[in-house]
């Protein structure tokens, strides 16, 4: 069997930074260290940090007074930041800098009273944090996921609008939504550069480049990982059977019946150790040749807060 490994895959700079922040906090301060929401959406990573003393909570009222709390890579609303400040909690912010960039765009729109439309998935923590940057009742913030949502959208002033996007969306689907917005609201303003992050784009391009060369695509990532789900969907749209797996235990031997070429990638929050385990599990089913497929090189690094260096 030929196993093609897509590149780039796995951890991005924002995930690396977020995990490093939790690890350094655990090293420098006594556990428990509280983390609001899963620092990244990966079961393996979260369990590893739990075993080292991290305590994951969904709300700040679960964090005792005088504690250290870390905000996840997905970001938080202004209300959460204000609550942490009011309670005097020591905060380390693991929000991805590319998410922070979107937050600043929304906050700027709020200050100017410009209605803001966010393209994203309802219920995702990044979306909740981004919408929570807007607090001007003179304008408003709206969430859309599809061209159908755009068709139903009602705004106060069609000539005073901007849009931003969640960073981990499908590039193709997002382009369709943006096109619908621009047709309905010709004067709408968007970001100077696409808000979908470089790592999301690169991993989707890697899947796009390989999908039609294989009969099966395995994406390593957790079920609640937005960017991992988009990789699986993209492979399927290319006509390739694709599955999302948390680890090697999820790999089903029946998927490989009659398959000669399989590709493997990993979402931006999945560590390489899980990819290796999946490849090893596939290789046990049949003699295999593993090939690294060339892709976009990534050298972006985001520094951790100075206090944790």
UniProtKB/Swiss-Prot annotation:
Reactions catalysed, as given in the entry: isopentenyl diphosphate + 2 oxidized [2Fe-2S]-[ferredoxin] + H2O = (2E)-4-hydroxy-3-methylbut-2-enyl diphosphate + 2 reduced [2Fe-2S]-[ferredoxin] + 2 H(+); dimethylallyl diphosphate + 2 oxidized [2Fe-2S]-[ferredoxin] + H2O = (2E)-4-hydroxy-3-methylbut-2-enyl diphosphate + 2 reduced [2Fe-2S]-[ferredoxin] + 2 H(+)
UniProt-annotated binding residues for isopentenyl diphosphate: 41, 74, 124, 225-227, 269
Record-annotated active site: 126
Pathway: Isoprenoid biosynthesis; dimethylallyl diphosphate biosynthesis; dimethylallyl diphosphate from (2E)-4-hydroxy-3-methylbutenyl diphosphate: step 1/1; Isoprenoid biosynthesis; isopentenyl diphosphate biosynthesis via DXP pathway; isopentenyl diphosphate from 1-deoxy-D-xylulose 5-phosphate: step 6/6
E.C. number(s) listed in UniProt: 1.17.7.4
Enzyme type, top EC level: oxidoreductase
Cofactor requirement: [4Fe-4S] cluster
Pfam families (alphabetical): LYTB
Positions contributing to [4Fe-4S] cluster binding: 12, 96, 197
Manner of cofactor binding, per the entry note: Binds 1 [4Fe-4S] cluster per subunit.
One of the GO BP terms on file: dimethylallyl diphosphate biosynthetic process
A molecular function GO annotation: 4-hydroxy-3-methylbut-2-enyl diphosphate reductase activity
Binding site residues for dimethylallyl diphosphate: 41, 74, 124, 225-227, 269
Residues that, per the record, bind (2E)-4-hydroxy-3-methylbut-2-enyl diphosphate: 41, 74, 124, 167, 225-227, 269
InterPro entries found in the cross-reference section: LytB/IspH
Keyword annotations: 4Fe-4S, Iron, Iron-sulfur, Isoprene biosynthesis, Metal-binding, Oxidoreductase
NCBIfam families found in the cross-reference section: ispH_lytB, PRK01045.1-2, PRK01045.1-4
HAMAP family: IspH
Record function comment: Catalyzes the conversion of 1-hydroxy-2-methyl-2-(E)-butenyl 4-diphosphate (HMBPP) into a mixture of isopentenyl diphosphate (IPP) and dimethylallyl diphosphate (DMAPP). Acts in the terminal step of the DOXP/MEP pathway for isoprenoid precursor biosynthesis.
PANTHER family, A to Z: 4-HYDROXY-3-METHYLBUT-2-ENYL DIPHOSPHATE REDUCTASE
Family designation: Belongs to the IspH family.
Protein name: 4-hydroxy-3-methylbut-2-enyl diphosphate reductase
Species, as recorded: Shewanella pealeana (strain ATCC 700345 / ANG-SQ1)
